[in-house]
Amino acid sequence: MTIRLRNRVNFFFFIIALVILAVNTAVFLYNFIAGNIAVPSDVISKSSFPLLRYDFWSVIASVIAINIYVVAVSFILLRTFEKTQATEVFFFLVFLTSLIFDTSRIYIPVRGISESFSYTLIHIGNLTLAARLLAPISLFALTAFCEEEFRQQTEQNCIICILVAVFFAVFLPVNTAIIGPNLCISYGFGKMVHGFSMVLYIASVMTLFIRNKKDSFSQINTAGFLMIIIGYNILFSASSIAGFASGVMILSAGTVIYLVKLHQHYLWID
């Protein structure tokens, strides 16, 4: 894929992300004003401390923050890397795709969806599960398949990442009767999915660390990448003010550090 075509894909992705943000926000606000938002009342808070106590609106804020993050970062990628050959941009867009899938959680509190065993709820469960699978897969691919010898297969590798995540998200069962505090629908083989994700996250950080050491490139880049992983998982799981705030800060800081160092790397190469 040429740089010009990549930039077009990036621009198209940015527009889609912007539209999804507008639709998600508008639909939620409409249902909130209409009194159609079912705020969970049976969630048992694990802490009595105000910042750590369960807060439904922190969950909603986290989902919206993820959506805003996708729009902002896709625009930054478009403007910052438009003249570079950074293969990482493709895989980062796939990672952002997983976050787009994750924003479907915002529809779960809408009355008529959360209070029924509808196909809509099942599809939302499939999307959130796909997000949980695609995030680690895309980040691992970002570190493992960005070398020169894999550059010709970048598009195919990105498509494979998405297809694998979607296939298993549809294949694995979801339990719409159980919805977590973070509005995530329960799914089968949860421990296996978490273990798989953890292995890929660790492998991706180690791969990037080794590659940066080999290329004599700053490990600050690796630290930023690790912060992206930590921040994303905190923000996804956030059900308190502290979780929301820390997730936003760590994810944002990690993204800035990683992308700045990555841009410096390609400026040096080009």
Language model features with spans:
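Hydrophobic transmembrane alpha-helical segments in integral membrane proteins
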Residues: R6-A17, A26-L29, S45-N67
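C-terminal transmembrane-bundle signature of multipass membrane proteins
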Residues: A17-G35, G195-D270
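The cytoplasmic-loop to transmembrane-helix boundary for the fourth helix
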Residues: R8-L18, A144-L172
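Alpha-helical transmembrane segments in multipass membrane proteins, preferentially the mid-helix core
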Residues: V71-I76, I137-E147, A169-I179, K191-Q219, ...
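Juxtamembrane "helix-exit" motif on the non-cytosolic side of transmembrane helices
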Residues: I108-S118, F171-C184, G231-A242
